[in-house]
Design a protein with these regions (language model features):
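Conserved acidic residues
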Residues: 109
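A conserved beta-strand element that flanks and buttresses the S-adenosyl-L-methionine
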Residues: 112
Length: 201
């Protein structure tokens, strides 16, 4: 992640401007955790975990969760939230775009990106995708939220749907669909977010 984006997120957390924090888990995540075709609990990686609401949701339902974020203030709040919820989550300070291949555990069966990768520059995005691929067990599921590409000032640059197969050549795309469950406002209200679900070969 670029220094500018990191500073931007740090400032927003400091000011309490966190529109990505939600009360309920996103519908596609809830389907994977609790739906009729849910995954058996295992190891989960939540990149850009923020204050930990999705990580805590999964941990309450038996998952062994690691949350990764670049903003220390967000991680401090995430740890407090986990303690208050009575669950154990491993929260790590780090940048998925700078993590070396092999630095993360290689046993994750569920990987969640609730809006991290779509803010990365192309070279960072390729590195992050390779790191996630290395961290996933065969059969693992990656759930990714991404805006459509476009210039929105300081907002995330987005991901072209046509890019996804090239970024994740060792994955099969299970579905992509509009993220109608996400309420966007302000400069990103027309960002046309989509959910992508991929399965590791």
């Amino acid at each position: 992640m670029s220094a500018g984006y990191k500073i931007g997120y740090q400032v927003m957390y400091r000011l309490g401007i966190t529109p990505w924090v939600h009360g309920e888990p996103p519908e596609p995540l809830a389907a994977l955790i609790e739906g009729p075709r849910s995954l058996p609990p295992g190891d989960m990686l939540d990149i850009g975990c923020g204050t930990g609401q999705d990580a805590i949701y999964a941990a309450r339902r038996g998952w062994n969760v690691t949350g990764l974020d670049v903003v220390p203030r967000a991680l401090e709040q995430a740890r407090r939230n986990a303690r208050a919820a009575g669950v154990a989550v491993r929260f790590l300070h780090g940048d998925i775009a700078r993590a070396g291949r092999g630095e993360l555990d290689a046993n994750y069966t569920l990987l969640l990106d609730g809006g991290c990768l779509h803010g990365l520059a192309p070279d960072q995005l390729r590195r992050a995708a390779a790191t996630l691929t290395d961290a996933a067990k065969p059969g693992a599921v990656l759930l990714m939220l991404a805006f459509a590409p476009g210039r929105r000032g300081p907002a995330p640059r987005g991901i072209d749907p046509a890019q996804v197969p090239g970024l994740f050549p060792q994955w099969d795309l299970a579905f992509s669909r509009p993220a109608t469950d996400i309420d966007l406002r302000g400069p990103v209200r027309n960002a046309s977010p989509s959910w992508y679900q991929l399965v590791r070969r």
